[in-house]
Amino acid sequence: MATLEQNLQEMLQDAVEDLGCELWGIECQRMGRFMTVRLFIDKDGGVTVDDCADVSRQVSAILDVEDPIADKYNLEVSSPGLDRPLFTLPQFERYIGQDIAVHLRIPVMERRKWQGKLERIEKDMITLIVDDQEQILVFGNIQKANVVAKF
């Protein structure tokens, strides 16, 4: 069964692309009786406030018609930022050689949180270098991941 995020991704992908942006990912977070739906958009040259406003208007219109969310919700549209979340294996591939942070659904070696250099991706496995040791993690076990911004 598809998750709400997957359903929204499929429903909104084309509309966001028609506005010249990439739908980087979607997060849905329940806060009490309300839900926050976060859309992350990206494009070459960076995302502007106008891009976010245009996507927000278009997406709001689609959600009003399709009504896929049963509860009241707030819609947020933004760029992924420097510490961008990673949602798909192709997104992980873009950041090979960089530091990422990963939060797992099921602990590996009694740890849910890992941070290290993304070394490689093979099929559905990612390899991090953590304290000079390779740590192989199953993509399907990753709950959240993001690029670690370096300043």
UniProtKB/Swiss-Prot annotation:
SUPFAM superfamilies named among the record's database cross-references: YhbC-like, C-terminal domain (SSF74942), YhbC-like, N-terminal domain (SSF75420)
NCBIfam families linked to this entry: PRK00092.1-1
Pfam families from the UniProt entry: DUF150_C (PF17384), RimP_N (PF02576)
Biological function: Required for maturation of 30S ribosomal subunits.
Family: Belongs to the RimP family.
Record's subcellular location: Cytoplasm
Gene: rimP
Protein name: Ribosome maturation factor RimP
